[in-house]
Amino acid sequence: LTQTIKDLGLKPVRLINTHCHIDHILGNAFVAKTWDLGLEIHKGEIPVLESGLMVSGMYGVPYDPSPKPSSFLNEGDEIVLDGHVMKILFTPGHSPASICFYNMADGWVIGGDVLFYESIGRTDLPGGDHATLLKSIREQLFVLPSETIVYPGHGPSTKIGYEKMFNPFLN
């Protein structure tokens, strides 16, 4: 990670999690220490973040505990990075307070683990709720333009219009 960031001439300026499942917080301590960044999450993710040590033990995964949040992100807030404005969309269901980052001007959304190519986020982990996830997708993501590119937390990108038509979990 460090070498790629250096090779690309980048400088991390924020540490933001879409949600706090263990696979998304494993690097928080490293990133926070390396670039002196505070963690930003939705307040509703605190219980999930605080369960990180227990969950890592269940999976046998080494874990340097994440720092506590330095600030909280709320639905409708805007994040500006290098001139790109991203609006916070509240999309619970995969976790209690998942958020997505929508860039209207450039036509993309960072979807975390809410919506995937022909799939959706799992809801069998603590704080997950299938009906809530479906509602979030339909009311927060499926109202975006069809050509909006979705960059999920895992797997290939997709488009809102494609998922409306072909996602078997939503049709």
Regions found by a protein language model. Give the residues of each.
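Active-site HxH/HxHxD metal-binding segment of metal-dependent hydrolases
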Residues: 2-80, 165-169
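Metallo-beta-lactamase
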Residues: 54-58, 78, 84-171
